[in-house]
């Protein structure tokens, strides 16, 4: 006797009127999934069709909830890695749309009708902007670090300060990347102090490169010292070695003056080392990419590495990066949203907060607070901001707002919305969404 005879047929579930609005492939998948799950935990109790349909609809709603969707970033973290880091300006997107939605000359030379370079147009703009000999783009800065080390130092040794052997989000650790690239690591100095003589004394027959890694996601305070890249480059040059700066998150132009103290500018650094790399979607404010700048002969070696094929970027990334570079070269900084959010003055942020507060149906308090740069950038710096605080259980409010795709934060046991990271074009949507929420 079939013990599952009480189960409704899959077809009857799929064809039920209550599932009519869902796509066929969604209905088939979740009807089968729920029935299989119940069969695994089968009891002798009769399984009703209504109970199954209820579970199927619950699964479908959870599935849709997990889909990629836009959110309002009210966290106060400008370059929020979990929320996609830098936002692309609508005008840049419109400029890219014709290329993205059609065939393009991504790797085709329109002059001679032959295969062209995937990177040519972007690389010329990178050289213009940063005044470097040559450049290359890969899919992120971790890939850039791996490619540089594997291409220039394979089976050899690199020297790095113990205080710069960083770990970033997702357990990306510099020592492990060095090892994976087929390179031996020589650690020098201590966690808080490293001197030029430490590097000099560590140089041996198998040394190929001196590596400096910018501490972009943590800060050392108090009794500490490090060697700048210029001095490391001079030492490397004297000893016939290479110097490489893994910058991680560097700034280019027009950044808030409160943030730039002790923060290296890319254009200056590229003149002080043989090769450097940084992320395209952090302080640079563009698409995810690993941007490599440096000496022409070194970049040529990177281009010859078979790994480059695996690390190359697609036409979407190239399109967005190309338009961002145009904006920088034309000094049209308003199109770089990350810069705008970091540069917005306090009075502008206050106006946004007051507008929302005025139109909300709920009691809130306007307060001054601090925003963060985020994205593993400038951990020791913050920016003045205005927040709205909401009365009630902070954790419950945070969850309730998150269900409406509004990502706030908890500060001093209060749920708050930070208006530095809420864009002007999101204010009306924010007001309508909050006013439609019940039982706040």
Curated annotation (Swiss-Prot):
Reported cofactor(s): pyridoxal 5'-phosphate
Single biological process term from Gene Ontology: selenocysteine incorporation
Entry-linked SUPFAM superfamilies: PLP-dependent transferases
Pathway entry: Aminoacyl-tRNA biosynthesis; selenocysteinyl-tRNA(Sec) biosynthesis; selenocysteinyl-tRNA(Sec) from L-seryl-tRNA(Sec) (bacterial route): step 1/1
Gene3D superfamilies xrefs: 3.90.1150.180, Type I PLP-dependent aspartate aminotransferase-like (Major domain)
Top EC group: transferase
Record's keyword terms, sorted: Cytoplasm, Protein biosynthesis, Pyridoxal phosphate, Selenium, Transferase
InterPro entries: PyrdxlP-dep_Trfase (IPR015424), PyrdxlP-dep_Trfase_major (IPR015421), SelA-like (IPR018319), SelA_trans (IPR004534)
Catalytic activity: L-seryl-tRNA(Sec) + selenophosphate + H(+) = L-selenocysteinyl-tRNA(Sec) + phosphate
HAMAP family referenced in this protein's UniProt entry, alphabetically: SelA
Protein name: L-seryl-tRNA(Sec) selenium transferase
Organism whose genome encodes this protein: Campylobacter jejuni (strain RM1221)
